[in-house]
Amino acid sequence: MSDDYELKELQPPEGANCNYNINTPQYENNNNNNNNTSGNESPNILNSENQFNQVANELENDSKQFFSNQDPEMNVEHSNVAQNEQDFKLRSYFENSQRIALGNGQKPKKMGISIRNLTVVGKGADISVISDLSTPFVTIFNLFRPSTWRKSSGSTFDILHDVTLFNRDAEMLLVLGRPGAGCSTLLRVISNQRSSYVSVSGDVTYGGINSDEWKNFKGESIYTPEEDTHHPTLTVRETLNFALKCKTIHNRLPDEKKKTFRKKIYDLLVGMFGISKQSDTLVGNEFIRGLSGGERKRLTITEAMVSSASITCYDCSTRGLDAASALDYAKSIRIMSDTLHKTTIASFYQASDSIFNLFNNVAILEKGRLIYFGPVGLAKQYFLDLGFDCEPRKSTPDFLTGVTNPQERKVRPGFEGRAPETSSDFEKAWKSSDLYQVMLQQQLEYEKKIELEQPSTNFIEQIRNENSKTNPTKSIYTTSYFTQVRALIARNSQIIWGDRFALISKYISIIVQTFVYASLFYNMKSDVTGLFNRGGAIYAAILFNAFVSAGELGLTFYGRRILQKQHSYAMYRPSALHIAMVITDIPLTAIQVTIFSVIVYFMYGLQVDAGKFFIFLFTIFGSTLSMVAFFRALGNLSPSLYVSQNILNVFILFMFTYGGYSIPKNKMHPWFSWYFWINPFSFPYKALMANEFGDMNFTCNDQTAIPNGNYIASNGSTMSYQDQYRACPSAGAIEGQMVNGEFYVAGSNYIDAALDFKSDDRTLNVIITFLWWIFFVIINMIALELFDWTSGGMPHKVYKRGKAPKINDDEEERQQNAMVENATSKMKDTLKMRESCFTWNHIHYTVQLNGKDLLLLNDVEGWIKPGQMTALMGSSGAGKTTLLDVLAKRKTMGTVTGKCLLNGKELNIDFERITGYVEQMDVHNPGLTVREALRFSAKLRQEPTVSLQDKYEYVEQVLEMMEMKHLGDALIGSLETGIGISVEERKRLTIGIELVAKPHILFLDEPTSGLDSQSSYNIVKFIRKLADAGMPLVCTIHQPSSVLFEYFDRILLLAKGGKTVYYGDIGEKSKTLTSYFERNGVRSCTESENPAEYILEAIGAGTNPGVSTIDWPEVWKQSPELQDVQAELASLETAATVQISSDDQDHGPPREFATSIWYQTWEVYKRLNLIWWRDMSYVYGIFTQAAASGLIIGFTFWNLDLSSSDMNQRVFFIFEILFLGILYIFIAIPQFLIQKAYFKKDYASKFYSWCPFAISIVIVELPFVAVAGTICFFCSFWTAGIYYNGEYDFYFYITFILFLFICVSLGQVVSAFCFNVMLAQTILPLLLVMLFLFCGVLVPYEQIPNFWKFVYHSNPCRYFLEGVVTSVLKNVFVDCSNEDLTKFSNPTNLTCKEYFKPTYGNVRAVTKGDESECGYCVFKSGEEYYKTLGWSYENRLRNYGILWAFFIFNIIMVVSFVYLTKKPNR
């Protein structure tokens, strides 16, 4: 092949202010569009000035975007436009703005890019394997195996290999390639996002600035990913106005106000992208209704344009847009690139020729290698000359990427064996071409021009001029820190108000829980019997407000991706975001705390004193703020939510235990006592205890004071105890202390003696509480500035250990292509389709909307036969998916009428099982491999008479046929985590899961939705293979290319309202279809036109929607084609033309499920157990929590002795063990909800019934929970010195494990009942309040209000505590320590025992020191202690049985709720 090129200079149209006068190579070939040009003919060069003029004129004439309300500050002399004049064209606006800016001293930032020898190295597939619970042990074992040391780092591969290209300012570069070609990586590297790769070598310069120095200009080269990441509760206006506030430049036009400038730009951009009408619509997401997917994509693009970056990289930014919107978007960035000298690099999904021709150059990648870089006008001819052929009506971008696909490319006669086959072949051909040398010369000249003109000098100067004058000289931010904070405060307020329903729900939940708290401690006694309760009530108030703030942890991770994106756009400093959040927290927290405090303070019966009330309010306010900041700090310092939750659980346990309530400060062991001094709970607790107890006296009557009654003097006379030697039975009591004839304990003495708190420290503790808040705020600011936990790399696959495929060399690549061809040729023998015919007639579907019937399908009929591929098309809202749902029996709401017949017979209960339904969303369990998912489908959906070996062999055949053999042992994973298979591979897997079931018919809903052109082609071609193998199928498809449309045999076209427009054959080159419309009054369809777009346009549903003057449904009703359809339907329904095979008859009567309930349960359990086994973060998370909780609790209550205070400590030891169970309630909920979503999808296809799932998911948790409980038991039980004898210890152990089972199953009950996590989080807090507060420890049974006593009797925590506490304290004799004694003077010459004997007996009086002072010990045994709680040792076996009843009841509830919610609402 000989390629002759020359350089010609292109001149822009007269008057166009664009930088298009670049040296661009063009072919000198008048027949450059001729697909049959011989490879020996030398291409010549076309002068493309006419082509450019045509594009420029089209942009000028077709631009429908207008700028209204022209600001008076614009230079009217130049624009000749009045103030309120409209119809101001987009290009004219930009050109006018640019002229005015130049007159004002502003110059465009002309920053192109130049890349030489760029190689990006990524991690190979073997560098990470599928992790499971054995992974840590394997890792440790490998440390002692020298043979594994070298391999530990894993292999690497080149994501990009030796890429050299450039792009001038004001030019647009299109990057094309198949999935995995490296397009996204190239765009990321150009945007200077390199952290996720092993290494990046080569030179990348930005207007002469190298990549290291370019880091100082964050926001000047941005990467816009294909995902749309926005705050869902903001409107379009709020989202863009915020971006504009952060990016409003300083050097605006003279006297131009910021607000005017922002409004002008906003109106321009929303008009440009057609989202003006959606300005006040919420952005929304999958849970919040808002913008459509296409509208959200346009918002993403608009936000990127607001950033005003010099270099912008758009990665598949047209995904989800229709053809018209994509073209408008491309035109807009073309104009902006021309007029504002912006450098644009973009990769597109399914780019049309119209979009393609807007770009200057195109770079084509294949497996990381650059196989073409040059002008768009030369690309097609280049590959034609290499020996490839382009099909008629195939777009140029599809052709360019198609040549890299062995299944798609077509080699012209005479080039067999000569045309490139592998990626390296293509790269060699490119580097040996003359055009490659021309482009190298162009790049060299561009670099010399950069060196001569030094655009970086002007670039740096313009950045300084644009930035706020209050910013530091080297600041990368446009606006000042104060402006950023102010904008963020406004945005945070809008986010909260946008989701005001959640805010109101939160306050309602708080009010309800507050009344529960307050009613439990209602009107507490002010005597000594209420001392402990009063302290508990105050501590509960602190805990409640702290844990209400725990939701901030999840919100921190939710907003992380948005922060990363906007920070990469240099909109604001991350620390400014936190300052703004803190400021918006203050009023919201004040409302929350005020509501809580007003209710609680007065219902508690705390001192009615204004000063004390406001100190209470102020302290709770500071404590809540500090905990909000603490939870955020934990999130900002953690790489993932799982990590932060595990750390949080440890902290919560520490904070609760070492707050000074459950363990007094003087009882804390030295190894953990230090935490008391850094505990955010301890300081507000000390402050509030001092506030309440500091000047309050707690009385006791004569009967309660000790000693009371009489004693026998040494002379034998009976004497009364003297008041000056009596006191209240409480810590801090002073003998003889009385007021108004009653003994009392001063509150200040009590908190000093019992808790070691000083009432004088109240003010200091309040101040420290707020200092904690400030400390955590600073930590958050530092963390946000220093850490970026978001991953920016490409998703990667992980395989089973030792199963990762090798990186193919050229020979292996050729062999793999040959294997695919061989598998394809054998497809018909592999599939062995049952020939079935499915018909539907007079289908109507009605739903209720606002009390009225809404008809969504109106008299639809049709059929699918073996070997036929039927397309289902129509405008948006025509009912395509609705019809498929009805035909596949997936509708659970509404009313369906009409007849659906399979082989001329009514549908049986096995219809869903024998029918394959490929839904639009690819829902797969991420914890399985591809092969495991396919085998699971085959085992449960194929007939039980088929052997397991045959099922597995069939799976392998389908894997090979789907070209996924190398992915069999790859983890499915998820796109969100960046680990797993690609989008296209997921779509293939979705189809494969239906195929291995050997379905009779196949329904496919939008199988190409969201895929690039090559993936779409591969999917449709694969579906065609299924049809050729005898599979009857129907497939909805949205605006297919002309090439894809040719694969279909028949089409069912629907209009809005679910009415039939046409049903029949498409015909060769779509002649049958187009002739129907032409004959009924529509213009002729040209040879070059896409028939799919033609028919949609004809019925007013094309990419440019219009109003058709023809009533097409009525035309269809009067057409002879309808009569033919009805006649054929009648024939099919009466004749049953396709007979049921003898194999089917042998299977017996129809069954809803192919296998027995026991087999289903076993298989579902095995799958769930495998998923749990691989979920290291979940399982090791619960193990870690168990070990950490056990060690913390065990060493906190280290080696408890037999004093009376340690009796209380033993109870609190067991009470804190409950924390692990409560924790597992939280942990079980998200795991259950995730698996429940997969169950609903499986149940719809009749994999298995609801009962196997419910039973299996309960059982699968139990072994892991039992191990966790065992770990906690061994870490805590003997450490605390609780052991007494084997019988009691064993009872403790088995009861504890059973209690954990109850907690996990209780979490599953909540999950089975709830539809989502948000509802579960609303229910949980109230549930946990009931479990914790009404268990009989914090508030004894006698002190619980009568209204709430039913909760105590229905609380599993009560039965666990009663059984375990009585076992632990049984036969324990109390030996009071000196600190536990209530001491009295002995005014007699009697011994202490003699002095107390008449009233208390010998065992109750303990002498300490000499006989002049006696000590009184409250309890003589553990049994006496637990009887004060109303518990009995005799109830322990009963309690154990009741706990089993709770567990069984929970299982029944799980099964019941799963049954009731087994079908999604659709």
Swiss-Prot record:
GO BP of this protein: aggregation involved in sorocarp development; response to bacterium; sorocarp morphogenesis
PROSITE patterns, alphabetized: ABC_TRANSPORTER_2 (PS50893)
Species annotation: Dictyostelium discoideum
Transmembrane stretches, start-end: 501-521, 537-557, 586-606, 611-631, 641-661, 767-787, 1178-1198, 1214-1234, 1253-1273, 1290-1310, 1319-1339, 1440-1460
Record region (Disordered): 23-47
Annotated PANTHER family: ATP-BINDING CASSETTE TRANSPORTER
Family: Belongs to the ABC transporter superfamily. ABCG family. PDR (TC 3.A.1.205) subfamily.
Residue ranges annotated for the ABC transporter domain, each copy included: 138-392, 838-1082
Gene Ontology annotations for the cellular component aspect, listed alphabetically: membrane
Membrane topology term: Multi-pass membrane protein
Keyword Signal attached: no
Designated name of the protein: ABC transporter G family member 10
UniProt-listed Pfam families: ABC2_membrane, ABC2_membrane_7, ABC_tran, ABC_trans_N, PDR_CDR
Biased composition (Low complexity): 23-45
Localization of this protein: Membrane
Binding site for ATP: 874-881
SUPFAM superfamilies: P-loop containing nucleoside triphosphate hydrolases (SSF52540)
Gene Ontology molecular function: any one: ABC-type transporter activity
Chief location category: membrane
Keyword ATP-binding recorded: yes
